């Protein structure tokens, strides 16, 4: 159950594994 990294698919409101990335559906992106 690892969190997605930048560039991977995520769910709205979800978290990303790497600090400085946020979930902007449908992908984790750098802030």
UniProtKB/Swiss-Prot annotation:
| Gene Ontology biological process terms in this record | defense response
> How this protein is processed and modified after translation, per its record?
This is a cyclic peptide.
Disulfide linkages recorded for this protein, renumbered to the chain, are 6-21, 10-23, 16-28
Note the SUPFAM superfamilies from the entry.
Cyclotides
Residue ranges that the Swiss-Prot or TrEMBL entry lists as coiled coil: none
Instruction: Tell me the residues linked by Cyclopeptide (Gly-Asn).
Output: 1-31
Keywords, ordered alphabetically: Disulfide bond, Knottin, Plant defense
| InterPro entries noted in UniProt | Cyclotide, Cyclotide_sf
Top-level taxon of origin: Eukaryota
What's said on domains? The presence of a 'disulfide through disulfide knot' structurally defines this protein as a knottin.
- What does the sequence similarity comment in the record state about its family? Belongs to the cyclotide family. Moebius subfamily.
The record's function comment reads: Probably participates in a plant defense mechanism.
Q: What is this protein called?
A: Cyclotide glopa C
